[in-house]
Each structure stands twice: as structure tokens, then as C-alpha cells.
């Protein structure tokens, strides 16, 4: 497959938010992880690591391109115009893995072929997760209406855009106890 495939890894990172998070975490985390969600290492203060220096969420800037990071990303993206774009994220610690298909309703400009492809890929993902006994959800949230996400922008440009979300987020730290008494570790993520 790779002989006829071009794979591009989008290196766009929120450097300001990452630095904010890393500096905060290194200041407050102990030598051994504290699994309690009440521990300070799981309670990052405002504005957290999500927004950039101007407190803008880069995950919502694809269409508007108001931030320099997005402009750099789109210059490359629009030059390549990929056929498939996977947008990887972390979500709250108590949510299992998420993958397409997106929640209804789909935006009216999304073609039947794009919908069918996304649904078919989601079924294959679900089959693999079921075989391994891994928790997941799809079709329940994360719609394809707002045009400026990392799955909708590619979809509106004719590609197959998909979001993948795994448990983690800034609250996870190195390890944390989830609501179902499971231990979520950085290694698991």
C-alpha cells in the first residue's frame, strides 16, 4: 500500500500551550505519579495548555486561519490536498476511544460517498476494537457541521476527514484513576 501512498504527518503543534503545560506539570508533579484525580498534577490551572499564546484554540481555526500556526499548516495542506486526513486528539480521561463516523446530522455539502466511506471505515475500526475488547464509541458526538475542525475542513475540501480521540487530556498526567476504577497511564495512551 505504501508504494502508492504519500503519508504526511502534520507537525503542527501548539508550542505556547505545550510549554505552558510542561512547565506547570514539571513544577507540580511529584517523583511518583499520584493516581488521585484530586491531586494538583491532574488539575492544570487556566488557561491550560489547549490555547496558544493569544488564547485561541487552534483546533477551531482551520477555515478562519486567524493564527500563524494555522496559516503555516494550511499552506502545506492546501498545496497537497490529501485524500484522507485523520485528526488525532485526546479527550477527557473517562471517555473511551472515539472514531468516525461522526454524529448526525452531517452537513448538506458532505457527499453520500464521503458519508459511506467514513461509515465503512468506522465499522472496520469497531470490528478491530471488538476483537480486542477495547472500549470505544462513535456516531454519538463530534458532528461534521462546523467547517473549521480538523475533520470538517478536509471533508468540505473533498477529502475523507476523520477525528480520532483517545482518553487522556491534560488531566491524565502519567497515570490517573478513572471513574470506573481503571488506571489510565501515559503508556496506555
Where are these regions (language model features)?
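Predominant activation on well-ordered alpha-helical scaffold segments within soluble catalytic domains
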Residues: 74, 122-126, 161
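Gly/Pro-rich turn-and-neighbor structural signature
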Residues: 4, 126, 130-139
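Hard-cation-handling environments
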Residues: 134-189
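Active-site/substrate-binding loop(s) of hydrolase catalytic cores
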Residues: 1-120, 130-131
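Long, well-ordered alpha-helical scaffolding segments within enzyme catalytic domains
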Residues: 118-124, 189
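Generic serine detector
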Residues: 32, 36-43, 48, 66, ...
Amino acid at each position: 500500500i505504501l508504494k502508492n501512498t504519500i503519508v504526511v504527518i502534520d507537525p503542527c503543534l501548539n508550542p505556547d500551550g505545550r510549554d505552558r503545560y510542561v512547565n506547570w506539570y514539571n513544577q507540580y508533579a511529584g517523583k511518583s505519579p499520584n493516581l488521585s484525580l484530586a491531586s494538583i498534577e491532574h488539575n492544570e490551572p487556566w488557561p491550560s495548555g489547549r490555547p496558544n499564546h493569544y488564547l485561541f484554540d487552534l483546533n477551531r481555526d482551520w477555515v478562519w486561519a486567524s493564527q500563524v500556526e494555522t496559516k503555516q499548516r494550511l499552506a502545506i495542506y492546501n498545496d497537497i490536498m490529501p485524500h484522507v486526513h485523520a485528526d488525532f486528539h485526546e479527550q477527557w480521561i473517562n471517555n473511551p476511544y472515539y472514531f468516525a463516523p461522526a454524529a448526525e446530522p452531517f452537513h448538506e455539502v458532505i457527499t453520500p460517498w464521503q458519508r459511506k466511506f467514513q461509515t465503512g471505515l468506522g465499522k472496520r475500526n469497531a470490528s478491530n476494537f471488538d476483537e480486542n475488547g477495547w472500549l470505544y464509541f462513535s456516531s454519538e458526538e463530534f458532528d461534521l457541521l462546523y467547517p473549521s475542525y480538523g475533520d470538517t475542513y478536509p471533508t468540505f475540501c473533498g477529502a475523507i476527514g476523520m477525528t480520532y480521540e483517545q482518553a487522556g487530556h491534560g488531566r491524565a498526567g502519567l497515570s490517573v484513576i478513572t471513574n470506573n476504577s481503571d488506571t489510565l497511564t501515559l503508556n496506555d495512551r
